[in-house]
Amino acid sequence: MAAEAWLWRWGWGWGQRCPGRPGLPGPGPSPTTFLHLLLLLGPVAADITDGNSEHLKREHSLIKPYQGVGSSSMPLWDFQGSTMLTSQYVRLTPDERSKEGSIWNHQPCFLKDWEMHVHFKVHGTGKKNLHGDGIALWYTRDRLVPGPVFGSKDNFHGLAIFLDTYPNDETTERVFPYISVMVNNGSLSYDHSKDGRWSELAGCTADFRNRDHDTFLAVRYSRGRLTVMTDLEDKNEWKNCIDITGVRLPTGYYFGASAGTGDLSDNHDIISIKLFQLTVERTPEEESIDWTKIEPGVNFLKSPKDNVDDPTGNFRNGPLTGWRVFLLLLCALLGVVVCAVVGAVVFQKRQERNKRFY
């Protein structure tokens, strides 16, 4: 198990990510080292490769050289709003006020397990806290629907990863830029005034703006586990940002990216999107499920992430969710039962004591 864990960490740092990032600099294991690993840990490596092998899905990927430069569309992808295609990047918004742009994949994705690598850049002339608003990455039922959430629609169905660069809530203790995750079945609204805290599942601070080197984000969804990692330090190493279990996402949704600016602005660029299929063994019962009928959601005993920032990570001042109401009612009922039992015992003893005086 120790060898397997070490090889897994090695895979995250170098081997597994390299197929999706062939141009990144940085040292890696030499062929001799890799050969020794295969000889010493052959069974472990074989199990990992067979269980989680990766395959680039070009029909869901955006890779240079782009086709359709200078036009408003390209094969497999549709543009909207201020989006502009150049030979080096797809610019969702320029560094100008009141702009919205998005890019959406033509093809619905029917993969149950996948990993997406996004090469992006957010930059502009604005100084600290005088820029905005950020990029959203989507896996949703609807596409090409403009709206107030980073250039796309609110009350969406599916998954959103927000790369937020501006703190709208002046009372927040968070450090921006900030990456957060939201899963929605259409019933939740993203609250910009609170930077989405009411509906956020998890998040992390990530200093990705105005970097003088490449910045990357990885999103992995496999067997209900959603993981978000970043590579922002030009070290060719993934750093953990978000890790959530119990996430339910259907198949047949669309991948996309959008951005928006308001009174403050930035350039929001997508350089590449690469989607990999993860081959994962499943039981016959899992294979028999109609994954297109699954409703987006998360198995949570607590409300989504802190609605009021708490350095300890505890939930404070959150809304009364169904579980909270149930637990409160259960505690109240137990309290009533305990009081009733204690009262009955005390009453009975008093009655017995009174009988002795007659």
Curated annotation (Swiss-Prot):
Cofactor needs: Ca(2+)
MF GO annotations: D-mannose binding; heat shock protein binding; metal ion binding
Transmembrane parts of this sequence: 325-347
Keywords in alphabetical order: Calcium, Disulfide bond, Glycoprotein, Golgi apparatus, Lectin, Membrane, Metal-binding, Protein transport, Signal, Transmembrane, Transmembrane helix, Transport
Glycosylation sites: N185
InterPro entries: ConA-like_dom_sf, Intracellular_Lectin-GPT, Lectin_leg, VIP36_lectin
Cofactor details (free text): Binds 2 calcium ions per subunit.
Superkingdom of origin: Eukaryota
Membrane topology value: Single-pass type I membrane protein
Pfam families: Lectin_leg-like
Name of the molecule in the record: Vesicular integral-membrane protein VIP36
